[in-house]
Amino acid sequence: MMANYFRSTFKFRKTTVSTLFVLTVLVISILTWFDANKYKSNLPDDKSSNSLLDAAWHDLQVITEKPHPYTSHFNDNVHDYLLQRVEQISKKSKFIEVSDDSANGVSKLFQHLDVFNDSSTETRLVYYESSNILVKVEGKSPQLPGLLLSAHFDSVPTGYGATDDGKGVVSLLALLQYYSENQPERTIVFNFNNNEEFGLLGATIFTYSEWFKLVSYVINLEGAGAGSKAALFRTSDTATALLYEKSVKDQPFGNSIYQQGFYSRFVSSETDYKIYELNGLRGWDIAFYKPRDMYHTGKDTVQHTSKAALWHMLNIAWQLSKYVVADQTTASQEILDDESNSSPAIYFDIISKWFFVVSARQLYVWNIVLLCVLPITLILLRIVCNKLGTWRMPTSALFTRIPFALFVSSFTIYFTKELLLQLNPTIWSRNFILPFLFCISEFLLINTLVLALFEYLWPIQDFKTLSLLELSAIAWLFLLKCTWDLSSSGFKATGVYPVTVFYLFISLASMFGLCSMCFGKRPNATNDYDNSEFMRPDTNDTHSIECPRQPEDSETTETSPLINTPSSSVQSSPIASSKSLPGAVQYLQRTLNYDWSAQYLLAVPINAFLIWESLFNLFDALSMTVQESNKATEAVFKFAIYGAIFLCSPLLPFTTKLNRFVVIILGVVTILAASFSLFAAPYTELAPLKLRFVQRIDISRETKQNVEIYGRAGANIQEVLSSLPSRPNVSCKDSGSGTELCVYEGMWPNFGIPMKVDVVKNTHNDKEHFEYEPYFADLRINVADNRLCLMKFNTTGKKHLKQVEFKVGNETTTHSYRTDEGIDSLLLHKLSWNVPYYDVQLKWIPQYTAEGSSDTLGVSIDCYWGEFDETIVNGQVVQKIPAYNELLQFLPETFIVSNRESGMVTIHKYLEL
């Protein structure tokens, strides 16, 4: 009885397959939710950790009281508070030394690489006055290569910087507290750096420090979102990834798909890690990455994050740094020195519990082995099945059903993508799960209907094994392409590992099906091809049909039917012939009637979970970028379509066994998800549209000012801005790539026009100037209460400017830079708010061509102010930038504002010398 119950329960039938499918979906959903929320309940329970966390949380509240960009006065307050905390922590430790760049007058003029554009040929000069706070914790073994811990304490003008990068900064304070009481083996240098947001300058200036020579490794803490979990964005190589794996046992989180985004420049932004990497350090870039709708806005506050998120970053940095500098210095150094670990790493976590690392070079070797061994094995098994006569499917069945179903379903979701692009392209920024679920359910539904129709009209012996073989062949081609990409990219295509896993498990499932077929019931010697065995679409077994038995004395006569029916004698002949087989073979035949379950478990759950987790993390990071450009939108849609196909493909061999209830549910889910995706409002209070603000004052000829708002086209920005209380006259125009620029005359800032440019001398107008003699011009840029100005040259021709000299205020030091390649721009910073001007001397050489000489130098000067808080004018408290405050107060809740440039207000002056 139990045997019959077992057979009836676990046969390859619709109820069983449907139940297993539903269980797979439920388990993956539960694991995903658990993974996304587990960190919230993972706060420390020991006293020392709680003490560090509480202190860090208090520090975070203090430094995020106001926005604090480099161009703000409150930036100095944050610097002073951090310096006071650092000195308080380190005063009792004899092995700690503190250095303040601001007090030491650290400044530098240097040519700055364009880290956002590797192909740039511009000569960009930067003069930077630093206020970094450096702390050296001397190690017990100072001869060992040291570790740098880095985070930046500046914010953007519109953000309070709780996550970007307040949590990184206070995590460093907590780690400093720990290492002040527990001297490490390696030397640690802490870099609390300033002005990361607009040029990564705090990290750059540190590379000129003597303490930079002490370190070989870096842990950079960053915030590219507004909370949740801190991900391992990227790491230098397999050795550093292995150290993360060995050290971070509590809540590891990261995926090398993110790393490939940086390698390929798909991710256009950068962090301080890039500067350290370019200067020879190896290490880890650990960052918050979501939600981007709060990133660089007024919602990047303590109120919109949590202690749990702070603890996640602090705990990871603590575990990793302890392993490297204290607990396992010898073991870690052996791993770091191992040349076999020098290639880029492929890594990923499983539900923040297990972390897996493999060398990209090693994966390349494995791919080649799999590409060679698995197809040969499958071909040999196929030949064996032919020899044994157990393969009884016509050749015409090969590469027809699955390719046709994939074509129809792919065409359908491509049409859906185009429809969604037209009607609601930015719905992903509100909720990426439902649009993606729409793609998944639609793809599955179309394939189920098409393949079920095939099976009804043209049933075959073992559709699932045939389909798995076809999928294996298709996956082989994709793996070949990925392996080529892995090699041609210098092993930097670190996001291709899901294709390897997919091909491996699909091939194993195919292999199992062929092995089962080898032990299947063979046809009667007198009837080599008994089509009736597999012509019923509702068959419950894999290779044979359970049919009513004929009486044993039944014989074939002249009146027997020409085509056997289920009650004909030939149907019983395999059963009769099987009695002559050995008992072990008969047992295998009975057991392998349930081979479908092994094939399902090999092909579906592991692939589905790994692919879903990768896609979920990818959409989590990228879904809100649809607001930024058409390119980003196209990328998200591409990931959705290819991701849905990739995710659902392992299930296709089993879709013909999904019962009508599952099919109905798929249909309902498709309709509901489609309705939401096509018609729901893309922006809400919890998922607002981000607008980018700058107020530009032009004093080139007549003084005029405009507010410029950049945002996603098609979001009724003009209508919303026109309804502001000031009733501005708004004009909008396309700014390219799916965005628009809206301009209107806003309310004037309440700090006057604190910029004036005087041309003190210009030899271009000197009548005694010789024809081939260089020109000189002396400028004085008067800027009160300012820290940042940008000069751009050659705006009327080629690179004429060859030399620049300048002084900051009345200081005696002259800074000079000369290059025959020409200078494109000069970025000037000064820490003192009381220094009223820059004196700049420019030297340029006229260009002589057949058409004549070109000797005019164009100079564009922009100075930035980054504060929008209150000020006192004529005894009254007023807003510094009322145009911005009007937006904050009166924009609908579905909009949020970020900065467009380095300051909230830009004053512009153009000269021709």
UniProtKB/Swiss-Prot annotation:
UniProt keyword terms in alphabetical order: Glycoprotein, Hydrolase, Membrane, Metal-binding, Metalloprotease, Protease, Transmembrane, Transmembrane helix, Vacuole, Zinc
Residue ranges of the region described as Disordered: 540-578
The keyword Ligase belongs to this UniProt entry's keyword annotation: no
EC number: 3.4.-.-
Parts of the chain that traverse the membrane: 16-36, 365-385, 395-415, 432-452, 466-486, 495-515, 601-621, 635-655, 661-681
Biased composition (Basic and acidic residues): 540-552
Co-factor note (free text): Binds 2 Zn(2+) ions per subunit.
Annotated positions binding Zn(2+) 2: 164, 197, 296
Primary localization: membrane
Family stated for the protein in its record: Belongs to the peptidase M28 family.
Functional description taken from the UniProt entry: May be involved in vacuolar sorting and osmoregulation.
Protein name: Vacuolar membrane protease
Organism: Kluyveromyces lactis (strain ATCC 8585 / CBS 2359 / DSM 70799 / NBRC 1267 / NRRL Y-1140 / WM37) (Yeast)
Highest classification ranks of the organism: Eukaryota, Fungi, Dikarya, Ascomycota, Saccharomycotina
